[in-house]
Amino acid sequence: MDSRGFDSEGREFSSATEMWAHEIGAAADAPVSAAVAEPAPAPAAGSNGVAGEEEAGGGGKREEWYSKAIAYWQGVEASTEGVLGGYGCVNDVDVKGSDAFLRPLLAERFGAARRHLVALDCGSGIGRVTKNFLLRHFNEVDLVEPVSHFLEAAQENLTECMEVGEDTHKAANFYCVPLQDFTPDEGRYDVIWIQWCIGQLPDDDFISFFNRAKIGLKPNGFFVLKENIARNGFVLDKEDNSITRSDAYFKELFKKCGLYIHSIKDQSDLPKELFAVKMYALVTEKPKIQKNGKRRRPKNSPRMIRS
C-alpha cells in the first residue's frame, strides 16, 4: 500500500507500508492471522453468555498496538454517548442510513419469501447497532466484542428488547473475542455487519479476518462494512491506535481479500466536523456483466432454509 498519510501527532508517512513498519514492525502486506469495540465516528483530523477473554493478539509491537486499543476502550463508559465519542446525537441518523442501505439488499439477495435470517455484529460494543437496527431485520444476531464491560452492557440492553414468538428476533450469542482472533461458524450468517471497528486492524489482519469470515456466510450472504473515510491516504489516531483509510485504500484491500463491491452509499447528515462515512456491500462472487456492459444483479433462486 503506497498511500501517503499522517498520524494525530503530525508525523507524516510516505506510504502505509512505512507507517505499519513503524507501528507494528511489519510490512502492510505480510500475511498474519483479525477489532475493538465500535469506536466513535471520529472528528476529521488534522462498537455492540460471554465467551473468551480480552486479548490483544500477536507479539512485540503488534501486541502493543492491540493492547493500547483495548486499554483505551476499557476506559470508555458503556453507553451510547461513550461508544460514539460524545456524538450520541448521530445514533438516529446512523440507524436511518443503515436501514435504507440494507433493506433493498436483503430483498434482492434473499427475496420476499418468509425466511430465518442470521447476522453477525462485529465490534458490537454495547449492542447499539443490534438493538436499534439489526434486530428489525434478523431473527438472530450474534455479537463479537473484545471489551468485556461493553459486552456485559450489551447483554443487559438486549434482554429487554427480545421478541418471543413463532418469528423470534433475538441476540443469540455473545463472543468476547477480538476480530483478529475470531473465526465464525461455517455457513451461519446471511449478513456480517462490520461498523466503526475495522480501523483497529492493521492491513494484514484486515485481510486475514475477511478471508476467515467468508466461511461464515450462507449462500448469497454478504458483508456490510460501514466506516469513516479519509479524503486521501490515511490518518492514524495515536490515542486509540486506529486508522482511518481512504476509499481508494479500502478498495485495494478489498481486492486483496478477494471481495467485490456490490454497492456503495454515503452516510448523510453527519456533523460537518466528522469524517465522511461510507457503507460498502461486499460479496464473494464476481458480479456478472451483461452485454451492454452493466453489472447484472443476481436473480433470486430457491435455496434451503437454514437456521
From Swiss-Prot:
Catalyzed reactions: N-terminal L-alanyl-L-prolyl-L-lysyl-[protein] + 3 S-adenosyl-L-methionine = N-terminal N,N,N-trimethyl-L-alanyl-L-prolyl-L-lysyl-[protein] + 3 S-adenosyl-L-homocysteine + 3 H(+); N-terminal L-seryl-L-prolyl-L-lysyl-[protein] + 3 S-adenosyl-L-methionine = N-terminal N,N,N-trimethyl-L-seryl-L-prolyl-L-lysyl-[protein] + 3 S-adenosyl-L-homocysteine + 3 H(+); N-terminal L-prolyl-L-prolyl-L-lysyl-[protein] + 2 S-adenosyl-L-methionine = N-terminal N,N-dimethyl-L-prolyl-L-prolyl-L-lysyl-[protein] + 2 S-adenosyl-L-homocysteine + 2 H(+)
Superkingdom per UniProt: Eukaryota
InterPro entries, alphabetized: MeTrfase_NTM1, SAM-dependent_MTases_sf
Protein known as: Alpha N-terminal protein methyltransferase 1
GO MF assignments: methyltransferase activity; N-terminal protein N-methyltransferase activity
UniProt record similarity statement: Belongs to the methyltransferase superfamily. NTM1 family.
EC number: 2.1.1.244
CDD domains (alphabetical): AdoMet_MTases
Organism per entry: Oryza sativa subsp. japonica
Free-text function comment from the UniProt entry: Alpha-N-methyltransferase that methylates the N-terminus of target proteins containing the N-terminal motif [Ala/Pro/Ser]-Pro-Lys when the initiator Met is cleaved. Specifically catalyzes mono-, di- or tri-methylation of exposed alpha-amino group of Ala or Ser residue in the [Ala/Ser]-Pro-Lys motif and mono- or di-methylation of Pro in the Pro-Pro-Lys motif.
A GO-annotated cellular component: cytoplasm
UniProt feature, compositional bias: Low complexity: 38-51
Region of interest (Disordered), ranges: 38-60
Biological processes per GO annotation: methylation
Keyword terms, alphabetized: Methyltransferase, S-adenosyl-L-methionine, Transferase
